[in-house]
From Swiss-Prot:
One of its GO terms (biological process) is proton transmembrane transport. Keywords: Antiport, Cell inner membrane, Cell membrane, Ion transport, Membrane, Potassium, Potassium transport, Transmembrane, Transmembrane helix, Transport. Pore-forming subunit of a potassium efflux system that confers protection against electrophiles. Catalyzes K(+)/H(+) antiport. Interacts with the regulatory subunit KefG. This is Putative glutathione-regulated potassium-efflux system protein KefB. Disulfide bonds: none annotated. It is a multi-pass membrane protein. The lineage of its organism: Bacteria, Pseudomonadati, Pseudomonadota, Gammaproteobacteria, Enterobacterales. GO terms for molecular function: glutathione-regulated potassium exporter activity. Residues 356-475 form the RCK N-terminal domain. Its main location: membrane.
Length: 557
């Protein structure tokens, strides 16, 4: 992040001067925050969001109100009127959503208690944008002229309509798109959803990031969650980087030079007040002592919402001259993160208990369903990936957590939890997909135990050559079992038939391994015939030897 900021300063008006129209770039680059909030929304379904209500409306509200009150009081000690001080206090109480979320991700705070609390505070700050903007014309004494209650009521109705429409329309629309099987169309639809929800909220005069966050939450429990995240992630990273570069370009180093002492004092006071409030709230909430300062430091910088609020206040003539220079608050970012972010804790509490699957099952057809049901019955945490949308819809009707997506995409595996999982079970129908997945897992997720489905001996050879020893030939075991039952019907003792089955399995596996070097050789067919004769001879010899021995089961008949 610091690199992006320095790059922005270097190419901006106060650096080499390559870019002069910073405002246009800054407005466009805000889409990075919009995409980031959509992905954050995908990670929180409504039930989990409801579980955070205490921290959102408790700690979040307390942080905004206490910080705003203290900062407004300090501003009133200077030459600010009380109305301007209130607006200034609210603006400075906010934190930078983009910077704070990025810092929390870099430091691994997302799955800790402090990260959960930090996200709750940021979410409440986004919600507080609406009443804060509505407060400005009231403080300016122009409510009658500029505060149209009818218009506000219509915006509320439109907002509710968006929630209801999104709740009942998004999944059917994406189901129709996924049925086409064209990945590019799915990506285009995802971009349309994110940009459309952002522009709709912007038209209502609300936060674009809040709109995309809500869209993400509405789709968090859908079968398309991981595929949506994979489709949007490259755009999020690119635009978020542009956002930080544009912030660096917009820094007014001239104000810093002419008002250096005032800037330093302002930054120190702002940081000190917010750290004090955040630290006390973290202590009251019960956050571990080792995480309190980290939590307070990450959220103690100024936020981009101050630009919007202060420009609105200036248009209402609450501010005069150059009383405010909110852009300067961006300078505290990386210094604070280095000062207050200690080493990551090994005993961090998980944010979402089921967010780290033990097993990823790829493919949920007839073969994969048996494996999945067995794992679920034994309380294993699994994530199932399936690219047949009809199968996904059917399985979700019966309560299975199956997600739509092509598992041969590395980003999809990563978002599905491959980095935290212990094993992956590959049950693809196509051998090419199976081998491609094996290669991807060995290259990008070498810690995973790979278990695979082999349709026949050819696939079994390929898996063994690739180093996969845990596999199952789909017809082999069932055919052996039926063969054992056939031997019993022909008069063989059940125990003897069981022994015959085990012998055959062991000898066949040995022959399978011996044939690996000649798997692609032209003499494979003749060698297979020879091996089959050897197998019959060995099998017959061992079975005759067993018949000579006194069988323990026969003794008690």
């Amino acid at each position: 992040m610091l690199g992006y900021l320095l790059a922005g300063i270097a190419i901006g008006p106060w650096g080499l001067g390559f870019i002069s129209d910073v405002d246009e770039i800054l407005h466009f680059s805000e889409l990075g925050v919009v995409f980031l909030m959509f992905i954050i929304g995908l990670e929180l379904n409504p039930s989990k969001l409801w579980q955070l209500r205490r921290s959102i409306f408790g700690v979040g509200a307390a942080q905004v109100l206490l910080s705003a009150a203290l900062l407004a009081g300090l501003l009133m000690l200077t030459d600010f009127a009380w109305q301007a001080a209130v607006v200034g206090g609210i603006g400075f109480a906010m934190s930078s959503t983009a910077m704070a979320l990025q810092l929390m991700r870099e430091k691994g705070m997302n799955r800790s208690e402090s990260g959960q609390l930090g996200f709750s505070v940021l979410l409440f700050q986004d919600l507080a944008v609406i009443p804060a903007l509505a407060l400005v014309p009231l403080l300016a004494g122009s409510a009658d002229e500029h505060f149209d209650w009818m218009k506000i009521g219509m915006k509320v109705l439109e907002f509710v309509g968006m929630l209801i429409g999104g709740r009942y329309l998004l999944r059917p629309v994406f189901r129709f798109i996924a049925a086409s099987g064209v990945r590019e169309v799915f990506t285009a639809a995802t971009l349309l959803l994110v940009l459309g929800s952002a522009l709709f909220m912007d038209a209502l005069g609300l936060s674009m990031a809040l709109g995309t966050f809500i869209a993400g939450v509405l789709l968090a429990e859908s079968e398309y969650r991981h595929e949506l995240e994979t489709a949007i992630d490259p755009f999020k990273g690119l635009l978020l980087g542009l956002f930080f570069i544009s912030v660096g370009m917009s820094l007014n180093l001239g104000v810093l030079y002419t008002h250096l002492l005032w800037v330093v004092i302002s930054v120190v006071v702002l940081v000190a007040v917010k750290i004090l409030v955040l630290y006390l709230l973290a202590r009251l909430y019960g956050v571990r002592s080792s995480e309190r300062m980290q939590f307070a430091g990450v959220l103690s910088q100024g936020g981009e919402f101050a630009f919007v609020l202060f420009s609105t206040a200036s248009s209402q003539r609450l501010f005069q001259g150059d009383q405010m220079a909110p852009l300067l608050m961006k300078l505290v970012d990386k210094w604070l993160s280095r000062q207050f972010n200690g080493p990551e804790e090994e005993d961090e509490k998980p944010w979402v208990n089921d967010d780290k699957p033990q097993v990823i099952v790829v493919g949920f057809g007839r073969f994969g369903q048996v494996i999945g049901r067995l794992l679920m019955a034994n309380k294993m945490r699994i994530t199932v990936l399936e690219r047949d949308i009809s199968a996904v819809n059917l399985m979700r009707k019966y309560g299975y957590k199956v997600y739509y997506g092509d598992a041969t995409q590395v980003d999809l595996l990563r978002s599905a939890g491959a980095e935290a999982a212990e094993s992956i079970v590959i049950t693809c129908n196509e051998p090419e997909d199976t081998m491609k997945l094996v290669e991807i897992c060995q290259q990008h997720f070498p810690h995973l135990h790979i278990l695979a489905r082999a349709r026949g001996r050819v696939e079994a050879h390929e898996l063994l050559q690739a180093g996969v020893t845990q596999f199952s030939r789909e017809t082999f075991s069932s055919a052996l079992e039926l063969g054992r039952k056939t031997l019993v019907t022909l008069g063989m003792h059940p125990h003897q038939a069981q022994r015959a089955q085990l012998h055959f399995r062991r000898l066949d596996m040995r022959m399978l391994r011996e044939l690996i070097p000649m798997h692609a050789d032209t003499v494979q067919i003749s060698r297979a015939r020879e091996a089959r004769r050897e197998l019959e001879e060995i099998f017959q010899r061992e079975m005759q030897q067993e018949r000579r021995q006194l069988d323990g089961w026969d003794e008690f008949e």
